[in-house]
Amino acid sequence: SPIVTHKDSNPMAKSIYIRFEWAMKRLLRDKANHEVLEGFITSLIGRKFTIVKFLESESNAQDSDDKFNHVDILAENEDKELVILEIRNEHEYTYFHRMRYGASKVITDNINLGDDDGRVRKVYSIHIVYFEFGQGEDYVYHGYTTFKGLHEPHDTLRLSISETERFLGVKVKHRADTPSAGELFPEYYVLRVNDFDQTARTPLDEWISFFKTGDINPDYKAPGMERARQCLRVDSLTKEEYASYFHHMDNLVYARSALESAFERGM
């Protein structure tokens, strides 16, 4: 959604809905509201996920610096496989540097999940960015690891039958049925919110439209959107939550002003 400027007397006057990154670290941690995040993740990845818990890493702390709008989630897919989902909302122009090591930090921060450790199937690193990020014609990008042969470029490294069972818990009979070795490595999704300038045609488009405009069209039917209409209203906040949200919005204005000034000076 558009970042308000100091010209606005009330930073929250533009929308009746709460900004997603603030809600993500606070309201959406409530189990009653998990449907919102689950709906967004399902719309993006194309598989149904159920949140098991929020991982209490340092970056998940609710009182951390506002610029680190970041949560780590342990979730289960429809095949009962556990995955870790890292979701970041960012306004930093140096974001490529953070993205480079973020997924690795998620893994090291949460390497000891007790009985769940061996069941973690995948890490998804989801990045919602609100600034000019790289160059490209699309507004959603998907990155993943593929191992190609150096001397046989058409050859892709695959897991062996035993590795497939050991690492993924899947039994296969034929070598041709084993997955790519890249399946063991994190996948990245980048949503360049400000580059979305069209009518929402898919459930994911509806979510991105909400991220950009701060508004939820009455016709939107994406997974989780109906619950978002109910729990993300500004007028539903308590007095304490309202004060915290106002402080967050004011910090957002200041941070963007400082970043843009530094960017213009070539810093």
Give residue spans per PLM region:
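Elongated, amphipathic alpha-helical interaction scaffolds
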Residues: 2-267
